[in-house]
């Protein structure tokens, strides 16, 4: 058995490539059907992600949403939630309002106005200069982590990232780290790619270059690579047992 944790956008799912989506989903189904565990780990919230999983019939064993602030099992029971500190939100909001930023608070499922039930502040922006300016305005002002993605600036609790979320999941579910493989393409995948065995997508954020990871053209390619390793190990064990017998 193997455990694969995969980023969602531009790794599993592509808005502009239905053929690649289809091949990835078929590979995921084969991977799970062989008794392996497949975890989707994303910056999206649960409701947003679940829409695409249902629409495209994408199976999973676990979901890690909001960059690790929410963890769910295969029946969508929430195993873990990490909230933003309300006092930090009170510092963040005036800065964003003064900057006239387009933003919202996210409770892990939907937009919220409740500072006591917020896992992420999301600022909408596709402008690289504007995103950098927002990060510079807000960094080092509280106990939170702020980073820019393709279309947003994201603010989460500073105890949250994808690597830490995987460690929590493995502790909760008593899973074996030696079975884990990871794949991603963006800056929020950095920590898990640095600390676990895995690969990056060929088209990836430049920060991931410093990790010097193997590159693959698709999730499908990596899944079949892992399944081939499993088969080779099973054959090897069979012959060891056969000759001992």
Segments from the language model and where they lie:
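Conserved acidic, metal-coordinating active-site core of Asp-based
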Residues: 95-195, 203
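Active-site phosphate-binding/coordination module
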Residues: 19-109
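Short, structured coil segments at secondary-structure junctions
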Residues: 56-59, 67, 141-142, 194-196, ...
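Conserved Rossmann-like nucleotide-cofactor binding loop
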Residues: 11, 46, 188
């Amino acid at each position: 058995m193997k455990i694969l944790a995969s980023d969602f956008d531009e790794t599993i799912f592509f808005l502009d490539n239905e053929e690649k989506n289809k091949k990835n989903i078929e590979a995921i189904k084969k991977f799970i059907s062989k008794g392996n565990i497949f975890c989707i780990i994303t910056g999206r919230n649960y409701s947003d992600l679940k829409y695409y999983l249902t629409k495209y019939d994408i199976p999973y064993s676990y979901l890690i949403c909001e960059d690790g602030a929410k963890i769910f099992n295969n029946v969508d029971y929430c195993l873990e939630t990490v909230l933003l500190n309300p006092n930090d939100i009170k510092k963040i909001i005036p800065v964003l309002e003064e900057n006239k930023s387009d933003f919202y608070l996210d409770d892990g499922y939907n937009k919220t106005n409740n500072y006591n039930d917020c896992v992420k502040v999301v600022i909408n922006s596709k402008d690289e200069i504007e995103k950098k300016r927002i990060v510079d305005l807000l960094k080092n002002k509280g106990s939170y982590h702020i980073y820019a993605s393709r279309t947003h600036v994201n603010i989460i609790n500073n105890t949250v990232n994808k690597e830490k979320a995987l460690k929590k999941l493995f502790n909760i579910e008593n899973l074996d780290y030696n079975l884990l493989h990871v794949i991603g393409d963006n800056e929020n995948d950095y920590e898990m790619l640095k600390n676990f065995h895995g690969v990056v997508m060929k088209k990836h954020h430049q920060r991931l270059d410093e990790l010097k990871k193997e590159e693959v053209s698709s999730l499908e390619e990596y899944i079949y690579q892992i399944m081939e390793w499993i088969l080779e190990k099973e054959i090897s064990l069979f012959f060891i047992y056969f000759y001992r017998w």
